[in-house]
């Protein structure tokens, strides 16, 4: 099994939030790429591989659910998390139907983010293992 890059694409239209999350992820030892909207995220994802993508749901032009669908076409094995301050249990089921693997609520605490990222990379390793065992 090859070693996965510790890379995360984080998408949010709020600059202060992007900077804060970037700082947290760097403290956790991850290489972070930031995108300010869905269009920029798609451009980046077409050029580079990210095992984990975290995206805001409410963005101008293309929202997070549409972005998730388009990202799945580019990278079907990535773990994609929704990031929003307006999630309910019903929403989380709908997000899974769209293609999200999980979600984080704003504002996110450092320990919650750390736990979610660790869980995401466990999922990525499991997917990679299943793909390697598929004939």
Q: Which stretches of residues belong to each language-model region?
A:
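Two-component/phosphorelay signaling modules centered on CheY-like receiver
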Residues: 15-33
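Acidic catalytic/metal-coordinating carboxylates
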Residues: 36-40, 63-67
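Conserved phosphotransfer cores of two-component systems
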Residues: 46-48, 70-78, 98
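Active-site beta3 strand of CheY-like receiver
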Residues: 49-54
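Receiver (REC) domain active-site loop signature in two-component systems and cognate sites
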Residues: 59
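Alpha4 helix (beta4-alpha4-beta5 surface) of REC/receiver domains from two-component response regulators
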Residues: 66, 87-103, 115
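C-terminal output helix
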Residues: 108-118, 125
């Amino acid at each position: 099994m090859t070693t996965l890059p510790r890379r995360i694409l984080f998408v949010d239209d709020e600059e202060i939030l992007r900077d804060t999350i970037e700082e947290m992820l760097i403290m956790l030892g991850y290489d972070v790429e930031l995108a300010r909207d869905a269009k920029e995220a798609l451009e980046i994802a077409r050029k580079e591989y990210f095992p984990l993508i975290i995206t805001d749901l409410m963005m101008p032009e293309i929202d997070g659910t549409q972005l998730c669908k388009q990202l799945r076409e580019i990278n079907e094995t990535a773990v994609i998390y929704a990031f929003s301050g307006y999630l309910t249990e019903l929403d989380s089921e709908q997000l899974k139907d769209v293609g999200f693997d999980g979600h984080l609520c704003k504002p996110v605490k450092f320990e919650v983010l750390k736990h979610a990222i660790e869980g995401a990379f466990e999922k990525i390793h499991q997917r990679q293992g299943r793909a390697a065992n598929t004939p």
